[in-house]
From Swiss-Prot:
Heme b b562 binds at residues 83, 182. The keyword Electron transport applies. Binds 2 heme b groups non-covalently. One of its GO terms (molecular function) is metal ion binding. Coiled coil: none annotated. The cytochrome bc1 complex contains 11 subunits: 3 respiratory subunits (MT-CYB, CYC1 and UQCRFS1), 2 core proteins (UQCRC1 and UQCRC2) and 6 low-molecular weight proteins (UQCRH/QCR6, UQCRB/QCR7, UQCRQ/QCR8, UQCR10/QCR9, UQCR11/QCR10 and a cleavage product of UQCRFS1). This cytochrome bc1 complex then forms a dimer. Heme b b566 binds at residues 97, 196. A ubiquinone binds at residue 201. This is Cytochrome b. It comes from Dipodomys stephensi (Stephens's kangaroo rat). One of its GO terms (cellular component) is respiratory chain complex III. Belongs to the cytochrome b family.
Length: 379
């Protein structure tokens, strides 16, 4: 008798993706983040669905409805904090996943990598719109400042901004459409994640050595299901410590004040996971130049497969490139810190140097390091 998981049309798909999938025998814990991102997405969709049952996307009642969720709905405070901190967890896993991809040369799988970049952009858009929904001070002013950046686009900019706002300022129409998009986008992200997996399974997973592993594959289950389960347990332990003991650690106190168009907060800033890009945006005095730099800070990832000069895929045995990689990580952390600081000396010049270094490492120094390493190995 044949096994049902190998013959049933639906179970066969699951079997090929998660059970009998041939997987390299030497992939490390850094490969856990794909499944952890899937878990984060499930947590966000589930908690978001329950929040949407009680939330009202109206400028007069949005803030009150969030207060009502926290005070009157059974475990509403817990659902809200799970959702708010779940976004932070999502981005922590996302950035670690991208970092692993850069370190081990996973960007060589161009289709998978490009779908990943689209997933990153969709997730950033979803998180931004979600931040606007509680209709606190930082929600309102964050929405105003970030959407206003589109006015830098020549000729059509102003019309585009008013079209997105649904009026002449961020108001009820804006909140309504942001809620609609915030609800639908996670399902689009889930569909794109399936496409991401589809392309990945066409080539098979990369491994820390960056060499073909066709001669040494093991089934995904039970080896990597067990390994992923350990990752999930550790992640949830960290997550619920954050949610239950430090729920407001990563939030902004300004968002506990209702939105007031007549009172500008002293320092407008997005959530922590956008601060590095925000710092790059602010470091260029020209508005259009800043918007282009902001976009390029993410889209530069798409260039990685095309500017790789090294003949070794992974950075595991390339000390110069390793140094540059960790310099890049440090630089992104510096940019994150600068993005949260006011626009005044010495933060302005630090931000400009860090922004220049960000692009210089990726576009100039890493390709040069690859050529030097090839020469050192006489390749």
């Amino acid at each position: 008798m044949t096994i049902m998981r190998k013959t049933h049309p639906l179970m066969k798909m699951v079997n090929h993706a998660f059970i009998d999938l041939p997987t390299p025998s030497n992939i490390s814990g850094w490969w856990n983040f794909g499944s952890l991102l899937g878990l984060c997405l499930i947590i966000q969709i589930a908690s978001g669905l329950f929040l949407a049952m009680h939330y009202t996307p109206d400028t007069l009642t949005a803030f009150s409805s969030v207060t009502h969720i926290c005070r009157d709905v059974n475990y509403g405070w817990l659902i809200r904090y799970i959702h708010a901190n779940g976004a932070s967890l999502f981005f922590i896993c996302l950035y670690l996943h991208i970092g692993r991809g850069i370190y081990y040369g996973s960007y060589s799988y161009v289709e998978t990598w490009n779908i990943g970049i689209i997933l990153l952009l969709l997730t950033m858009a979803t998180a931004f719109m979600g931040y606007v929904l509680p209709w606190g001070q930082m929600s309102f002013w964050g929405a105003t400042v970030i959407t206003n950046l589109l006015s830098a686009i020549p000729y059509i900019g102003t019309d585009l901004v008013e079209w997105i706002w649904g009026g002449f300022s961020v108001d009820k129409a804006t909140l309504n459409r942001f809620f609609a998009f915030h609800f639908i986008l996670p399902f689009i992200i889930a569909a794109m994640a399936m496409v991401h997996l589809l392309f990945l399974h066409e080539t098979g997973s990369n491994n820390p050595l960056g060499i073909p592993s066709d001669c040494d594959k093991i089934p995904f289950h039970p080896y990597y299901t067990t390994k992923d389960f350990l990752g999930i347990v550790l992640l949830l332990a960290f997550f619920f410590t954050l949610v239950l003991f430090f729920p407001d650690l990563l939030g902004d106190p300004d968002n506990y004040s209702p939105a007031n168009p007549l009172n500008t907060p002293p320092h407008i800033k997005p959530e922590w996971y956008f601060l590095f890009a925000y710092a790059i945006l602010r470091s260029i005095p020209n508005k259009l130049g800043g918007v282009i730099a902001l976009l390029m800070s993410i889209l530069i990832l798409a260039l990685l497969p095309h500017i790789q000069t090294a003949k070794q895929r992974s950075l595991m045995f390339r000390p110069i490139s390793q140094f540059l990689f960790w310099l890049l990580v440090s630089d992104v952390l510096v940019l994150t810190w600068i993005g949260g600081q006011p626009v005044e000396p010495p933060f302005i010049i630090i931000g400009q140097i860090a922004s220049f270094l960000y692009f210089a490492i990726i576009l100039i120094l890493m390709p040069i390091a690859g050529i030097i390493e090839n020469k050192m190995l006489k390749w």
